[in-house]
Amino acid sequence: MDIKSALSRIVGHLDLSTEEMRDVMRQIMTGQCSEAQIGAFLMGMRMKSESIDEIVGAVSVMRELADKVELKSLDGVVDIVGTGGDGANIFNVSTASAFVIAAAGCTVAKHGNRAVSGKSGSADLLEAAGIYLNLTPVQVARCIDSLGIGFMFAQTHHSAMKHAAGPRRDLGLRTLFNMLGPLTNPAGVKHQVVGVFTQALCRPLAEVLQRLGSKHVLVVHSKDGLDEFSLAAPTFVAELKNDQITEYWVEPEDLGMKSQSLHGLAVEGPQASLELIRDALGRRKTENGQKAAEMIVLNAGAALYAADHAMTLAQGVELAHDVLHTGLAWEKLQELGAFTAVFKVENEA
């Protein structure tokens, strides 16, 4: 199916099949469509609402075209990532959590990008921390296999996305592509925590990942609007495990945490986010640093559970708490900085 035929279908509020969506996405991602066609397609999809078949088709093409990271094993390798777009502008919780997860002995293949709508994306934060981002897939694999953690910069691994960049920027609205990033990890991880900007996406994205072969995934959205587990409100979870999807609410108290306001956790940019994370992963000298630490523990614990590194959510949170207080997570961040600095010298020689 070509994009003109797809537009005719979408105008009539008719869904595309998975194969039809694959055809259209392949045309978009290989530069065969005009910016006007891409913009119209994205807006039409949003107005119609994307079906599970359509998302599966789009994700499968993005995965095919990605510059993949080949790891020695995917057993228990986890990603913790969000769609963004929640408007809260709190510090980089999932990126900070990744270092706690790795310090707990669980392998992390972190996928992320620069900020689109927020103040600090995962790439912005890591760059502020002195971590070199422009790695080849082989270099990323060496980080992950050697240190237990590595970062895959989305724009490096999904270069075909450049064809949709202009229309996405000009539209200035959430589109299909906002939900594709967390579903297209270049290492092909089977364990994830995926935060989404609306509860309505939790079950559908769990079903998408089920169809694409994921093993254990938590798709989450908190009642206060965050695309991650929140200290301030219940969090809705669609959990894929043993090829079954279950849905439930989790209160912070269910996991041994105290409910509290998120006041003081919003940041104006990556440097402010880094300073808060340094406090949270270090001595927690400030009230906000302590609160940030608890937010990190909550989300890192969920990822340890998704990775099957803990038997229950509560056990994952307890393990994350113990690890954070050792200071090993901050050391892991510094290790990654030193490791990638060697690659920077190699790449720029």
UniProtKB/Swiss-Prot annotation:
Binding residues for anthranilate 1: G82, N113
Residues engaged in binding anthranilate 2: R168
Gene responsible for this protein: trpD
Top-level taxonomy: Bacteria, Pseudomonadati, Pseudomonadota, Gammaproteobacteria, Pseudomonadales
Enzyme Commission numbers on file: 2.4.2.18
Matches recorded under NCBIfam families: trpD
Pathway: Amino-acid biosynthesis; L-tryptophan biosynthesis; L-tryptophan from chorismate: step 2/5
Chain residues that bind Mg(2+) 1: S94, E228
Protein name: Anthranilate phosphoribosyltransferase
Source organism per UniProt: Pseudomonas entomophila (strain L48)
Binding site for Mg(2+) 2: D227, E228
